[in-house]
Swiss-Prot record:
Domain remark text: Consists of three domains; the N-terminal catalytic domain, the editing domain and the C-terminal C-Ala domain. The editing domain removes incorrectly charged amino acids, while the C-Ala domain, along with tRNA(Ala), serves as a bridge to cooperatively bring together the editing and aminoacylation centers thus stimulating deacylation of misacylated tRNAs.
NCBIfam families per the UniProt record, alphabetical: alaS
Record's catalysed reaction(s): tRNA(Ala) + L-alanine + ATP = L-alanyl-tRNA(Ala) + AMP + diphosphate
EC number assigned by the record: 6.1.1.7
Descriptive protein name: Alanine--tRNA ligase
SMART domains: tRNA_SAD
Subcellular localization(s) per the UniProt record: Cytoplasm
PANTHER family named in the record: ALANINE--TRNA LIGASE, CYTOPLASMIC, ALANYL-TRNA SYNTHETASE
Gene name tied to this protein: alaS
Source organism: Rickettsia prowazekii (strain Madrid E)
Cofactor(s), names only, from the UniProt record: Zn(2+)
InterPro entries, per database record: aa-tRNA-synth_II/BPL/LPL, Ala-tRNA-lgiase_IIc, Ala-tRNA-ligase_IIc_anticod-bd, Ala-tRNA-synth_IIc_core, Ala-tRNA-synth_IIc_N, Ala-tRNA_ligase, Ala_tRNA_ligase_euk/bac, DHHA1_dom
Cofactor binding notes: Binds 1 zinc ion per subunit.
HAMAP family linked: Ala_tRNA_synth_B
Job of this protein: Catalyzes the attachment of alanine to tRNA(Ala) in a two-step reaction: alanine is first activated by ATP to form Ala-AMP and then transferred to the acceptor end of tRNA(Ala). Also edits incorrectly charged Ser-tRNA(Ala) and Gly-tRNA(Ala) via its editing domain.
Length: 877
């Protein structure tokens, strides 16, 4: 049996089907563009899904692909096994041939057998096939084409050999081909109890799409039958390289050996698994970034972060003290960049993201590992780590749950998933609408039904902190239920009346407890639906709760009081801003929490330190004067005539609540407030910033949180004094000296950057690409300032007459574009136009400059992967 490289296996598969009139279709992005139910492309057929369902027509009816695929979440979550088993991967390549109403079962089986036994030279006696137990035509074709006897054609009754796209749609039986690695490896034939062992390995799966599932009872024949096949490249290569572990094939071994040369730890024992994890996760991370995903804390970005951080933890286990992953990228690009050019195009961007993420995680990784070691000192084999510790590792140290599980795996310690999930839910679902999810339209109807039946909720919280109420509705998973009896279940509760304030008018909702006939219910949030239904978001802590029961509803008084003081302070702040900044100041938004307030206003410039001091002094003076705070219900028109402030664009009922604070403030407001301004205690602005053109944001704290802030700042000052080995009287002088030294170092750095960008004529020739007599030098660089880039680019265009220089510098959250054109060709190429087009392409607002030199900006880092194509289009045209 001939030994093939990974590249040869891929190439031979594609070449074979191209020779048989299949169109070679390039791999699609890992991000599905036609299936919102999928997080990632996980098989070759995904990009053809609409073709199979008849929603899309292509110019061809036969196709062959090598599709990059990823499985690391949801149904196909292989992450915990990756690196520890022989065939689990996050990223893998799926080879496939497809027929859309052209050839069917017999021809598909012929192609499979012909390619395996003739092109790949697999011994026929090593091959077994499975079919769906009623698929007699497939059995007859295998006998006719391959000469297989009945004992080599295994009939499977389970759905493993019957594929469907869902409850309805195209479906059909499958036929799988297995390779026998030999008696020396343990395992049984498909359909036996030992089928999941390593002797008999599935190498190819064919789906014969011959039916359409109409409903559970009805299945009809399709008029045009289709074929969908998949062969895992890594599995097939392992067979053809005579190894029983995918990580032993040439592609992985080259990455592993390259890694070993850097970390200097031998590839054996436990280290072997770490090398495999890193090799696999390097591929997954790099391809995801190339396809536009960047690490984040949600969705696809979080899957990427989980993969990257798992790899980084294994790099740490190998003793890597500095970022490692980005150093391995050139080897991956060398191995796979030709077949997947997006890797080459995005190489510098991928490298930057890998390095940044590893630097970011390094500190918290070490601290988190220290915490985990401390918390598991007393845990024995078979023990369970508390959900609280797992959540702290996740929330404080950035440890994905599966990373914590991976670390504990070798010690046979598990994690309390239930406890972890409870803490996750408490954190995630404090926002008012987080529970809506994908059932929003269904939920809307549910709330309309509730309002129609029960009317609005009566709010008692202006005068009461607790009240006896009747439970009129319980909602779980967007469905009305009669009772809740599972402890720690989350649900929504509606009463006929309540002292709990529902989030509105910028004020967050109340928290507290509900008691009813032996039950205890924690309220973790309160909000409004349809403006008048007050909804309590609850967790059952004890007993059970039924519709129709009377219950005692108790708000958290301290939490409410902190909301009151911050809300009243917001009104005072608004009035003081009118006095100091002018009557033209209009509120653009606000948020009142139990720990701070946020207030947005229209204002054309930054508020000065002097103005901030004046604002604080006047607000605190009003607080000290202990003015009475009163509320009155008035007709909206009358309130506005009396000078009450109403928010522009806000809808008000005919009658409104008006809050008056002494002679200082008069506003329409439905929120809760203190009785006297002295209850606020004190007021301190903690930040002032721009959030949009002409919009400023002020954040402030009140009462006990001012004391807390002073203590924190005092502690920080003492820490700084200690670090600088000085006292507060000499601290400013010390800082000025450091800043002056920093300026000197920056000048030296600028000189170094300029020198690094300076090229000889010979170097320019080597680093440029030429088309129609024009040389293009394109470089992505780090965070180098525009002045240096401009000078460097101009210097180069003075050396060569037909040169266009384009630098793109990566800033923290933006891109900087510098374009220079040799003066001899400025009649044909304008640097200002090129810079403007590149800026618009990269999400900027355009730019400009002279014909020979121009600069602009952008912020679309993802689109940077397509910049070469855009740049050449500008030059060629």
């Amino acid at each position: 049996m001939t030994k093939f490289t990974t590249e040869e296996v891929r190439s031979k598969f594609i070449t074979y089907f191209k020779a048989n009139n299949h169109t070679h279709v390039p791999a699609s992005s890992l991000i599905p563009d036609n299936d919102p139910s999928l997080m990632f492309v996980n098989s070759g057929m995904v990009q053809f899904k609409n073709v199979f369902t008849g929603q899309e027509k292509r110019s061809y009816n036969k196709a062959v692909t090598s599709q990059k695929s990823l499985r690391a979440g949801g149904k196909h979550n292989d992450l915990e096994h990756v690196g520890y088993t022989a065939r689990h991967h996050t990223f893998f390549e799926m080879l496939g041939n497809f027929s859309f109403g052209d050839y069917f079962k017999e021809q598909a089986i012929y192609y499979t057998w012909d390619l395996l036994t003739k092109e790949f030279e697999l011994p026929k006696d090593k091959l077994y096939v499975t079919i769906y137990h009623t698929d007699d035509p497939a059995a007859s074709y295998w006998k006719k084409i391959a000469g297989l006897k009945d004992d080599r054609i295994i009939r499977i009754k389970t759905n493993d050999n019957f594929w469907s796209m869902g409850d309805t749609g195209p479906c059909g039986p499958c036929s799988e081909i297995f390779f026998d690695h030999g008696e020396e490896i343990y395992g049984g034939l498909p359909g036996t109890k030992d089928e999941n062992c390593d002797r008999f390995i599935e190498i190819w799966n064919m789906v014969f799409m011959q039916y359409e599932q109409i409903n559970k009872e009805t299945r009809i024949e399709l008029p045009k039958k289709s074929i969908d096949t998949g062969m895992g490249l890594e599995r097939m290569t392992a067979v053809l390289q005579h190894v029983n572990n995918n990580y032993d094939i040439d592609l992985f071994q080259e990455i592993i050996n390259f890694t070993e040369n850097i970390v200097k730890i031998k590839v054996d024992g436990e280290a072997k698994f770490s090398y495999r994890v890193i090799a696999d996760h390097l591929r997954a991370s790099s391809f995801l970034i190339a396809d536009g995903i960047i690490p984040s804390n949600e969705g696809r970005g979080y899957v990427l972060r989980r993969i990257m951080r798992r790899a980084m933890r294994h790099a740490h286990m190998l003793g890597a003290k500095e970022p490692l992953m980005y150093k391995l990228l050139p080897k991956l690009v060398d191995l796979m960049g030709n077949i997947y050019p997006e890797l080459k195009i995005a190489e510098s961007f991928i490298s930057s993201i890998l390095e940044q993420e590893e630097i970011r995680f390094k500190t918290t990784l070490e601290r988190g590992l220290k915490l985990l070691t401390e918390e598991t000192k007393t845990l024995t084999k078979g023990s369970k780590l508390s959900g609280e510790v797992a959540f702290k590792l996740y929330d404080t140290y950035g440890f994905p749950l599966d990373l914590t599980e991976d670390i504990l795996k070798n010690r046979d310690i598990t994690v309390d998933h239930k406890g972890f999930e409870e803490l996750m839910l408490t954190q995630k679902e404090r926002a008012r609408k987080s529970w809506l999810g994908s059932g929003e339209s269904k939920t809307d109807q549910l709330w309309f039904d509730i309002k129609e039946q029960y009317g609005s909720t009566e709010f008692l919280g202006y005068t009461l902190n607790e009240a006896e109420c009747k439970i009129i509705a319980l909602i779980k998973n967007n469905n009305l239920v009669d009772n809740i009896q599972e402890i720690n279940t989350q649900f929504l509760l509606i009463a006929n009346q309540t002292p709990f304030y529902g989030e509105s008018g910028g004020q967050m909702g109340d928290i507290g407890m509900i008691f009813s006939q032996g039950s205890e219910i924690e309220v973790i949030d309160t909000f409004k639906y349809l403006r008048s239904i007050i909804v309590h978001k609850c967790i059952l802590k004890k007993g059970k709760i039924n519709i129709g029961e009377n219950a005692n509803l108790n708000i958290n008084i301290r939490y409410r009081q902190n909301l009151r003081i911050h809300h009243s302070a917001t009104h005072i702040l608004h009035a003081v801003l009118h006095k100091i900044l002018g009557k033209q100041v209009i509120q653009k938004g606000s948020l009142v929490t139990s720990t701070y307030l946020r207030f947005d206003i229209n204002h054309s410039k930054a508020i000065t330190n002097q103005e901030i001091t004046l604002i604080e002094d006047q607000v605190n003076e009003i607080i000290r004067n202990n003015h009475e705070v009163t509320t009155t219900v008035m007709f909206t028109e009358d309130a506005i005539k009396q000078g009450a402030i109403a928010l522009f664009g806000e809808k008000y009922d005919s009658e409104v609540r008006v809050v008056k604070i002494g002679e200082t403030s008069l506003e329409l407001c439905c929120g809760t407030h203190v009785k006297r301004t002295g209850d606020i205690g004190s007021f301190k602005i903690i930040s002032e910033s721009a959030i949009a053109a002409g919009v400023r944001r002020i954040e402030a704290v009140c009462g006990e949180f001012v004391i807390k802030l002073i203590r924190e700042r005092d502690s920080l000052l003492k820490s700084i004094e200690s670090s600088f080995k000085t006292n507060k009287n000499e601290l400013i002088t010390k800082v000025i000296n450091i800043l002056e030294r920093n300026k000197e170092l920056e000048k030296e750095l600028e000189k170094a950057h300029l020198a690094s960008l300076d090229l000889s004529i010979e170097q320019i020739k080597k680093q440029t690409k030429e088309i129609t007599g024009i040389k293009l030098l394109y470089k992505e660089v780090g965070n180098i300032n525009n002045k240096i880039l401009r000078q460097a680019a101009e210097n180069l265009t003075k050396k060569v007459e037909n040169l266009i220089v384009v630098y793109i510098a990566h800033g923290v959250d933006k891109l900087s574009i510098t374009v220079a054109v040799s003066k001899a060709i400025t009649d044909k190429f304008n640097a200002g136009i090129i810079a403007k087009e590149l800026s618009l392409f990269l999400g900027g607002s355009g730019g400009g400059g002279q014909a020979s030199i121009a600069q602009a900006g952008g912020n679309d880092i993802i689109n940077l992967t397509n910049i070469n194509k855009k740049l050449w289009s500008l030059i060629v045209t």
